[in-house]
């Protein structure tokens, strides 16, 4: 998930490689959540990709705009040695990143104009302690949270999801990474993102290509791949939950074909980029979610996801909603030729939705529900983010995509195919926000 931030002032540091600078003391934003009925006092850390990347010797920017400094970074090894990331203090959370928290409530703002910076979107991870991410084991568990997506227009995505990041952010694997989870290192997902400034403890500067439509981002030769369980990708118009699997275990750097980049290599990589998705609008239930819908995006709602095994491996990912004192079962769908409707993600559902929509079943090819089960058993890190889409304008979530298609499954939401241009949403909807709260994990409950 590609997000962007630009800073106009650097910080002083005295470290080498993907290590933490010492000028600014790191502060993690407090956030409470609930495990098995007991409150947990925890915190979140901001992704290292949002941090200032600068020379270890002075305040010279290693990364400026969407390019690496050619003197400090003539090659990746030299860049890794010359450049460092720095801490985020308490005031920077709100003033620079537009992120605030109170109790169990976390609010992410879209565009934040700080004294020295303009921040676009954000991505944070839940911590277990100062140096490690919280690892969630979701099999035979129920995960729930409240979300207010009412202030997210077409083209934005307020997401909550799990990925197979390393608990320590990669410090035990990569000797050049000593910043670790404390500084938000080690992000990965099933898209094998190339926009990470550091991957596997090394600067991703080799082959770096600045984006032609994002003044803050670019792509390097390396990508960072891992399993991804999208619990919630949504704005006020559309939503989905999606399982993505990979043929590799855990955090895996990639290059070349293994990254499965868009185009001819998309299905040749190590991860399933399409995923097996359950999206009510795409499945024909156009009145189920949205402003004034059965699940009304105009007010806060509770999202419940159950990971059911039946005593074995994962066999069902079930979705339930609560709003206004009512329990709302997930929208059901019938595919032609099926006797019984589906209302959850199962192996059979994934086969049938790919068949009906004519999509490549890369989910099955990369491991299917068994692969997802293995990833959940090993544990995953919780991510919350707000972003716009410089590749496809978020049309895959809330509009018709591909834009000229009339085939089943192309209609994914009510938004116009002209919507979602990042330049437009950043200029016209800078005050957009998403709020997550009341995060809980516990035994599976009955909601009949």
Swiss-Prot record:
Temperature dependence: Optimum temperature is approximately 25-45 degrees Celsius. High activity is maintained over a wide temperature range.
EC number of this enzyme: 3.2.1.91
Stored Gene3D superfamilies: Glycoside hydrolase, family 7, domain
Residues of the active site: 228, 233
Keywords carried by this UniProt record: Carbohydrate metabolism, Cellulose degradation, Disulfide bond, Glycosidase, Hydrolase, Polysaccharide degradation, Pyrrolidone carboxylic acid, Secreted, Signal
Assigned GO CC terms: extracellular region
Pfam family of the protein (one): Glyco_hydro_7
Pyrrolidone carboxylic acid PTM sites in chain numbering: 18
Noted pH dependence of activity: Optimum pH is 4-6.5 for p-nitrophenyl-beta-d-cellotrioside (pNP-G3), and 4-8 for p-nitrophenyl-beta-d-cellopentaoside (pNP-G5).
GO molecular function term, any single one: cellulose 1,4-beta-cellobiosidase activity
Subcellular location: Secreted
Keyword Disulfide bond: yes
Region forming the signal peptide: 1-17
Catalytic activity: Hydrolysis of (1->4)-beta-D-glucosidic linkages in cellulose and cellotetraose, releasing cellobiose from the non-reducing ends of the chains
Enzyme class, spelled out: hydrolase
GO biological process: cellulose catabolic process
Chief site of localization: secreted
Protein residues bound to substrate: 97, 119-120, 197, 230-233, 244, 266, 274, 396, 412
InterPro entries noted in UniProt: ConA-like_dom_sf, Glyco_hydro_7, Glyco_hydro_7_sf
Self-association state and partner proteins as the record states: Monomer.
Similarity comment: family membership: Belongs to the glycosyl hydrolase 7 (cellulase C) family.
Task of the protein: Exocellobiohydrolase (CBH) that catalyzes the hydrolysis of 1,4-beta-D-glucosidic bonds in cellulose to release the disaccharide cellobiose. The degradation of cellulose involves an interplay between different cellulolytic enzymes. Hydrolysis starts with endoglucanases (EGs), which cut internal beta-1,4-glucosidic bonds in cellulose to reduce the polymerization degree of the substrate and create new chain ends for exocellobiohydrolases (CBHs). The CBHs release the disaccharide cellobiose from the non-reducing end of the cellulose polymer chain.
Additional note from the record: Unlike most wood-boring animal species, which rely on symbiotic microbes for digestion of woody substrates, the L.quadripunctata genome contains a range of enzymes (including GH7B) capable of lignocellulose digestion.
Protein name per UniProt: Exoglucanase GH7B
Organism (species): Limnoria quadripunctata
Lineage, broadest ranks: Eukaryota, Metazoa, Ecdysozoa, Arthropoda, Crustacea
